[in-house]
Amino acid sequence: MEITCPDWTHETAALAEGFTCVVGVDEVGRGPLAGPVTAAAVRLFPGRIPEGLNDSKKLTALRREMLAAEIHTVAEVSIAHASVEEIDRLNILQASHLAMGRALAGLPSRPDFALIDGHMVPKGLGHRCRAIVKGDALCLSIAAASIVAKVARDRIMVDLEQQHPGYGWRTNAGYGTKDHLQALLNLGPTPHHRRSFKPVHNILYQEASISP
C-alpha cells in the first residue's frame, strides 16, 4: 500500500494562478454527540513549514500538541467554533460551514484563496475556494488546520469534563462510545449534548414519555 503524505502541490498551483494569500481550512467535531464543531484556517509560509504535518487522525495526541504549538509560532492561525445551539438549530453541516467562515474571517491577513477539506465548498465564504477530498492527508495547509482544530477542540472537551464528569469526554472527545452512551442513559444529557443527534434525542424522548 502506498503511503501518501501531504505536500505543497495545491498551494503551489494556487500561487501560480496569481493568488497571494493561500490558506488551508479544516473542521473537527462533526460526529460527536457533545461539544462544539471547531474549524481552523492556517496560512503557512514556505521555509517555515513544520516537519511531520499530516492528517491529525494519523498523529498521536502528544505529536499533535507539539505540532500545534509550532504551527501557532510560524504560521497565521485562526480557530473558530459553532456552538451546540447552532448545531441543533442549523444542522451539523451548516454549523460546520459557519465555523469555517468564522475561522477565515479571524485570520490577520485576508485570504484570497482557501483550500478546504472535503467535497463541498461552503456557500457565502466570500473567498475563492477549492474543495479537496481527503485534503488533510494531501495538502500541507489543510493538514496544519486539521491539527490545530483537533487540539483546540480536545482542550474544550477536557475543560467540559471538569464541569460534567462521568461522560469520558477527556478520552472520547464527545463521540458516541459505548461508555459515553451508557453515561447518557445513567446521567442524562447535559447542556453540551446535541439534542438533534439521534442518540441524545432518543434519550430525551424517553425521559419525556415517562415523566408524570
From Swiss-Prot:
User: Which keywords appear in this protein's UniProt record, sorted alphabetically?
Assistant: Cytoplasm, Endonuclease, Hydrolase, Manganese, Metal-binding, Nuclease
**Which Pfam families does the annotation name?**
RNase_HII
Q: Which cofactor does it need?
A: Mn(2+); Mg(2+)
Q: Which Gene3D superfamilies match?
A: Ribonuclease H-like superfamily/Ribonuclease H
- Its predominant location is cytoplasm
The RNase H type-2 domain, residue ranges: 20-209
Q: Where in the cell is it found?
A: Cytoplasm
What is any one of the record's Gene Ontology cellular component terms? Answer: ribonuclease H2 complex
Cofactor comment? Manganese or magnesium. Binds 1 divalent metal ion per monomer in the absence of substrate. May bind a second metal ion after substrate binding.
Q: Name one GO molecular function term.
A: RNA-DNA hybrid ribonuclease activity
Q: Which GO terms describe its biological process?
A: DNA replication, removal of RNA primer; mismatch repair
What is the similarity comment for this entry?
Answer: Belongs to the RNase HII family.
Stated name of the protein: Ribonuclease HII
The scientific name of the source species is Cereibacter sphaeroides (strain ATCC 17029 / ATH 2.4.9)
User: What is the phylogenetic placement of the source species in the record?
Assistant: Bacteria, Pseudomonadati, Pseudomonadota, Alphaproteobacteria, Rhodobacterales
